[in-house]
C-alpha cells in the first residue's frame, strides 16, 4: 500500500528534499516577497487556485499521480513559488503597466530640474547683460592742458571750484573729480618709482684731493732748500710772517730782539723804550730773527 503525498513522514526522502528546497527557495528567489503590486498578488491567487483544485481532485488516487508525474514532488506551495520565480525572469504585463507610473514620477522630476536649471541660467545671464561698462570719456587736448595747468596750481579742489572748472571746460563735476583723483594717484606712483630707482642706484661718492704733508716720517718739502712744498692755499700762512721785516722801529726791535739766541746783538740806541727795560737788540737784527723763527716753526710743524 502506497502512501499518499498529502501524508508525510519525517524520515522519508521526499520530506528531506522538501526541507532543503524550502531553505533554498527563500534565499534564491526573494523577488516574490519584494514585489507588492496588486497585479502580482492577483496573479499569485489565480495561479494558486488551479493547483489547489488539481491537488484536491487527485487526492483519491495516489498511484495515478505518481505515474503521471505532472505534479512536482515538492507539494502545491512549492510549485506555486517555483512557477512564480520562473515568471519573474520573463517580462510581465503587470510590471510593464506599473512601470509607467514610476517612470511618470521620475520624468517630471527631471523636467522640473532641467527647467530649474534653465531658469537659474537665465537669471545668471541677465545680470551679465545688465552690467555693461560705461564708455570711456575722452578729453580733448585743450581740456587736458587746462586741467594740468590747474592741477599744478592746486591739487585739491573744493566743490564750488570743481563746478566752476567743469562749466568752463564743458565737463561734468564728476569727470573733473575723477580726473584729479587719477592725476594724484599718477603723481604718487611716479614718486614711488623714483625713490625705488634712487635706492637701487646710490650716488657715487665725491673725491676730495688731500695734500700730502708727511711721507715716510719726513715732511714733504719742495725743490728749494728752504722753501716749503705747500700748495697755493697754504702759502698765505707764510706771508704774514715776512711782513715783520718792515717794522724796523726801535720799539718793536727792542721788544723781540732778546728772544732768539742766534740773532747777533749790538749796541742798542738810547731810546725811551730801551731805557724802560724792554731788552737789547739791534735794529738790523730784528727782521732776520723773525725770518729764522718762522722757518724753524714751519719745519717743526
Curated annotation (Swiss-Prot):
One of its GO terms (molecular function) is DNA-binding transcription factor activity, RNA polymerase II-specific. GO terms for cellular component: chromatin; nucleus. PROSITE patterns: HOMEOBOX_1 (PS00027), HOMEOBOX_2 (PS50071). Changing residue 151 to L: In CTHM; impairs transcriptional activation. Residues 132-191 bind DNA. InterPro entries: HD, HD_metazoa, Homeobox_CS, Homeobox_NK-like, Homeodomain-like_sf. Keywords: Activator, Developmental protein, Disease variant, DNA-binding, Homeobox, Nucleus, Transcription, Transcription regulation. Residues 22-135 are annotated as: Disordered. One of its GO terms (biological process) is pharyngeal system development. It is found in: Nucleus. Acts as a transcriptional activator. In conjunction with NKX2-5, may play a role in both pharyngeal and cardiac embryonic development. It is linked to Conotruncal heart malformations: A group of congenital heart defects involving the outflow tracts. Examples include truncus arteriosus communis, double-outlet right ventricle and transposition of great arteries. Truncus arteriosus communis is characterized by a single outflow tract instead of a separate aorta and pulmonary artery. In transposition of the great arteries, the aorta arises from the right ventricle and the pulmonary artery from the left ventricle. In double outlet of the right ventricle, both the pulmonary artery and aorta arise from the right ventricle. PANTHER family: HOMEOBOX PROTEIN NKX, HOMEOBOX PROTEIN NKX-2.6. Belongs to the NK-2 homeobox family. This is Homeobox protein Nkx-2.6.
Amino acid at each position: 500500500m502506497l502512501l499518499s503525498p498529502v501524508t508525510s513522514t519525517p524520515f522519508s526522502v521526499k520530506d528531506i528534499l522538501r526541507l532543503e528546497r524550502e531553505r533554498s527557495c527563500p534565499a534564491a528567489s526573494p523577488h516574490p516577497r519584494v514585489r507588492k503590486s496588486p497585479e502580482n498578488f492577483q496573479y499569485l491567487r489565480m495561479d494558486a487556485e488551479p493547483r489547489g483544485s488539481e491537488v484536491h481532485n487527485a487526492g483519491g488516487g495516489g498511484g495515478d499521480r505518481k505515474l503521471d508525474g505532472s505534479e512536482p514532488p515538492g507539494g502545491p506551495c512549492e510549485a506555486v513559488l517555483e512557477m512564480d520565480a520562473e515568471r519573474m525572469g520573463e517580462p510581465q504585463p503587470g510590471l510593464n503597466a506599473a512601470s509607467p507610473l514610476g517612470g511618470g514620477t521620475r520624468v517630471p522630476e527631471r523636467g522640473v530640474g532641467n527647467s530649474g536649471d534653465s531658469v537659474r541660467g537665465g537669471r545668471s545671464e541677465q545680470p551679465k547683460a545688465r552690467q555693461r561698462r560705461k564708455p570711456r570719456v575722452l578729453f580733448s587736448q585743450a581740456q587736458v592742458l587746462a586741467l594740468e595747468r590747474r592741477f599744478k596750481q592746486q591739487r585739491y579742489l573744493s566743490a564750488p571750484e570743481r563746478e566752476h572748472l567743469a562749466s568752463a571746460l564743458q565737463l561734468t563735476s564728476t569727470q573733473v573729480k575723477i580726473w584729479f583723483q587719477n592725476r594724484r594717484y599718477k603723481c604718487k606712483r611716479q614718486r614711488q618709482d623714483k625713490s625705488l630707482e634712487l635706492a637701487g642706484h646710490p650716488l657715487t661718492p665725491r673725491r676730495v684731493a688731500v695734500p700730502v704733508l708727511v711721507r715716510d716720517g719726513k715732511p714733504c718739502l719742495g725743490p728749494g732748500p728752504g722753501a716749503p712744498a705747500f700748495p697755493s692755499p697754504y702759502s698765505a700762512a707764510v706771508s704774514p710772517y715776512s711782513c715783520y721785516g718792515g717794522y724796523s722801529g726801535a720799539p718793536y726791535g727792542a721788544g723781540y730782539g732778546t728772544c732768539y739766541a742766534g740773532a747777533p746783538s749790538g749796541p742798542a740806541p738810547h731810546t725811551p723804550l730801551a731805557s724802560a727795560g724792554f731788552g737789547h737788540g739791534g735794529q738790523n737784527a730784528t727782521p732776520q730773527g723773525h725770518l729764522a723763527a718762522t722757518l724753524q716753526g714751519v719745519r717743526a710743524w
